[in-house]
């Protein structure tokens, strides 16, 4: 802080302003008040006056403090890099020796030069020795006593000053400086020591002078004077620490080198106590005056930033703390013998200044390793700094500022959705930049918020990068990169045969005879409601059969069966002919390009007519071989077994023509035929292996579910270890129930399987939400019509295929007046959560081949939820249809029940007109509606108000009797009018 007035100067010196004003006046400075300005020359005069008044006491110690702030980037536990502020403080204390003591030691060193010359020089990097203590002379100030041994401390890191080759240009008086151990406190302490024998000077003025000296940038000549003054004691301090020295071309007196060598060998420096005489005091006073003049000149110079001289290439082989310098030091010492007049030596100013600047460059990698500064980092500097402390800090900050990097325009592939953090990472910028740009665009986002592709591309373009609309990051592309199964050897495989046909035409019975097992008798209602997969070993080879349902509800299931098959056996009953599901099976087979084999079943029945079946199939473009077509017709009987062998022979012949092959030694691929949720085993899927070999323990992916095959059983319930092509198996271990018809693939990497499954779940969720949104919009328009009722249902089935069929059948029942709403449909037993959902939506729970848990039953009973169980799809559809019929608005029908003629009209006060009537036909009831006819034209329609016979109120009057009646709300009755009596009946409607 620069002080411009006496008051500011006094505040800086922490002394009263009037005392400072008196001192300035006594020093010859013409100032009248504390508000007058104080110049640098006035301060120099004050300092000179105080020194004259208190003797030649000078500042014995100068403290230099250096502070550097830098940043390092370090990764935290989450992997993100964080910026950490690092502040490094360095501090040096320089102590000045007494001139008389230096002169005495110089004389002794010159006297001992001849003795030390022939001695072998010690290595420069000798071990630290404490045998060379520096003892202050008697006339040294008492404050120097604790600092002298500090100069010989073994961990002193800064080099000492060398003997000057010629006197300094600015100051005639040398100012020897020896480096002392740094103070422990972080703040600079610039308080000069005072001799006890001399009068004490004001400490604040001395401290301010030293601070001014620190802040003022010294000239090179002044630096040279300070750094190259003769300092034998400092050299003896040097002997107590290792110091690598590199020789540099510089002339120097030869006498100082033996003295330094002697000091490094650890020889004690004899110190005498010279008598303090008047001549010594006069010499000290002259030295003080010279130094004061130099300080005044220094303070009056304009400030400028000086740069330390750059070291020559190869001149500095190591730093003060690097072992490289130890090897170079002995050679340098040998070259610096006294006899070598033209030898060169290292200039400490250049060396130390370079190490000071090198320290800044070494500091950056050191900071990245540890946030705390290392012990040797702050000592590696030298005395050749640039100007004052502030300028050095500014220079250091400039050096450590990250160099501005050139902007790199990147190509950024933007997917359909991307988070702010991921987008910033792709552009190699901070997320804050992306958020800032989005705020400029008027969008407030967080770092984890997901952006759509269009917005993200705008941000990328705004930040100067090239945006490329990338395809969705579909991990299913990994499936295309898997080893192709065709690389493995393709071997012949068994044909997969699907049995299709109309319901009750004998498909399962036919398979039952082939398998020699009673399956049909175990089916509920004698009809098949699941796909059954079996493989049969015949004398001609293995054949895999898929039995599909024939009921109309199972269209999707039959389509899946046709997709997975090689050959279709179309079963047609000889006594029934072609039916709707027969035609549908033909269409499925043709759409899949699958060859047909027609089995005309039930030929053992008396009413069987195979020829009629052929004619009907020809109409459906299924031409038998005897008619010139390519479809074999085989008459069979599932009851007697007639024609079964011919059927199998035709099937195997078709398979032989197809030349069915599949790789065996390859990862398995297959199709989910059926899936269900087993209470004890979890999700269970029936898989038809189409290629490769599925082994127990394989990681499989089926639609949006994945897992490891924990158990594998065949259709007979036996545990197996592997399944080859065309073999149906049941597997356990999937995470959830897959959808029937999903493709199954075995993967080597479970992580990749999980990734693909989660991706598919996300896609399915998006599609489902989009469908729900569309359905809500449609239902909104549908519900605009009045009287639309909704029947909410919750459907739980045993297998996924049955759920699909039942939901489709129930949804078809919807009409304009009553709509079926399937609130929830899933595979598995009826749980408590299903009942809670039914309570919330007021739904009916339908269980198809499943039962409710005990807790769910109690909850349903207590809340009045209707739970219905079915095992035949007909019954479920019929009962829901009946319930919907009950919800239909009844049909209203008008029925005429009588005819009355008005014979007389009586007018009675307070009542009005009363009609005396005769019932001509039918009867008249009191609550009936009346239509008044006048000249056979309807004149009024309303209700009877009262009906009397004589004086009694009656409920009805039959034909042939007279009565009196009044009309509600009408008195317009005339003789001869006819009253038509009618009732409105409600008739229940059906769907």
From Swiss-Prot:
It is found in: Cytoplasm. Residues 58-82, 106-405 are annotated as: Disordered. Residues 526-530 are annotated as: G2. Residues 601-604 are annotated as: G4. Residues 379-388 have a biased composition (Gly residues). Residues 492-659 form the tr-type G domain. Residues 501-508 are annotated as: G1. One of its GO terms (cellular component) is cytosol. Residues 637-639 are annotated as: G5. It comes from the Bacteria. Keywords: Cytoplasm, GTP-binding, Initiation factor, Nucleotide-binding, Protein biosynthesis. The keyword Ligase does not apply. PANTHER family: TR-TYPE G DOMAIN-CONTAINING PROTEIN, TRANSLATION INITIATION FACTOR IF-2-RELATED. This is Translation initiation factor IF-2. The lineage of its organism: Bacteria, Pseudomonadati, Pseudomonadota, Betaproteobacteria, Burkholderiales.
